Amino acid sequence: MDLYIQIIVVACLTGMTSLLAHRSAAVFHDGIRPILPQLIEGYMNRREAGSIAFGLSIGFVASVGISFTLKTGLLNAWLLFLPTDILGVLAINSLMAFGLGAIWGVLILTCLLPVNQLLTALPVDVLGSLGELSSPVVSAFALFPLVAIFYQFGWKQSLVAAVVVLMTRVVVVRYFPHLNPESIEIFIGMVMLLGIAITHDLRHRDENDIDASGLSVFEERTSRIIKNLPYIAIVGALIAAVASMKIFAGSEVSIFTLEKAYSAGVTPEQSQTLINQAALAEFMRGLGFVPLIATTALATGVYAVAGFTFVYAVGYLSPNPMVAAVLGAVVISAEVLLLRSIGKWLGRYPSVRNASDNIRNAMNMLMEVALLVGSIFAAIKMTGYTGFSIAVAIYFLNESLGRPVQKMAAPVVAVMITGILLNVLYWFGLFIPA
């Protein structure tokens, strides 16, 4: 019975996120948001927009989405929402958008267990090896505010920020081992980024007068988001409900902690402590995303399906799905209603607006590095340097062919192919796992 309820709720969630994408009201991928105004205004057709959405999203689905879910057994935002971005943009009407999204949700839940069982039965442990992705991804992602500072400001401010952020991690690990160092890193990094940006603009106030026309565009874009508030509130409710069912994790900073919290053999007290850590990490990450999501939403009139992502933490901490749904709807609705005020405040500081692109670039670069390093660890764990050699050969084959697989996804895809090849070699008697 529980499985059927989960399937229904997840199908409703993915159906609604696909509908939001179809209405150009909200998407998950930040890179898709800027192209949707062109679709709305008739400068681009759905096929063209859909092809762009596919190109931007498929690498994340193949690398982060599938690998994280196979490793942890938990659904994640990349696996659920990136495909619904594509389906929603491509769909010719609202009914088709909802239907295609719902079908995707059902397929994910019903196919996850068989695939997991198949992979865990293989002689070469592909799933266990993919667990090596987790530590580099989480640790690297926590540095995105710092790398954004490197991109935007001079070496002196970057050096000061680096010392503050990295020493914060050292102090937390040494004296506060019960806290999640990555969540504190993100928070301190964002405080430094906003502080440096605002200080820079205050010093150059005369050069950076507020653009009144820009504010009017902000208000015009916000009104379109508010018009879709009922749909966004439903999605916020469903996300929080799914998170409270212990089958979903919102991001890389919480998914591996929640995997431990929900695993067998963990006492209720230990589980709750881990859930609290995951919620804190998610909240800190959400704070880090406020400038990026708010500025892009105000500039494009397209919101994020999970808002500022605070609904994830709401879901983790809620006692049951009903309470989670109510709180999720309230939280994401409050975010939308506050968006105009946030936009006006951010609009006063051009450096904060400019930080959005730097944040996105920093996150992409860090994820590329982390997935490459994690994939190397995974290949070595799989079968030592035989696995490493095969994975590296596949990775550079992709490079030589002009990257048919996106650079970010290539290392993870290479490791997965390596695992398949090693299992084939085992069945032919050419390879024996150590």
Where are these regions (language model features)?
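Signature of multi-pass transmembrane helix bundles
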Residues: 1-53, 80-301, 311-434
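Membrane-interface helix-loop-helix modules in multi-pass membrane proteins
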Residues: 61-83, 309-318
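A glycine-rich, aromatic-flanked flexible loop/lid motif
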Residues: 305-307
